[in-house]
Amino acid sequence: TGADYVINGREVQDVPARIRELTDGGAHAAVVTAVSKVAFNQAVESVRAGGSVVAVGLPSEMMELSIVKIILDGIRVVGSLVGTRQDLAEAFQFGADGIVVPVVKLRPVDEAPEVFKEMAAGTITGRMVLDFASL
């Protein structure tokens, strides 16, 4: 189990092309948790015809996705959010007010297999962030 491939965006110039190459035409789905416009565009370019892009991250800027590619390739783009807009606004306010302090642990990406084992075992508290800068 685990990842079949790891692609370092600092080492690979065209990440979507590399994903399409490794997956024989593109990924079936991409889940974007980043808040970067680049990540969303790369996700659309990385999935195969009929694939899906799930948007979880909330970018602060307007997105400029390739509508032509989305339509011609039948790519499904969906948002994923748990709760209502009011719930989200309140959660952000709690964070801004210091009422809720997130528990975040940073681990080097080479520890990913151990992190996934901990996730499967249910022993992680808070959020776990994999540091790709450690590559």
Q: What are the residue ranges of the model-derived segments?
A:
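Adenosine-nucleotide cofactor-binding segment
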Residues: 1-42
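A local structural motif
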Residues: 26-27, 78, 98-103
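Helix-to-beta-strand junctions that scaffold the AdoMet/dcAdoMet cofactor pocket
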Residues: 47-49
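C-terminal hydrophobic helical "lid"/dimerization subdomain
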Residues: 41-44, 85-135
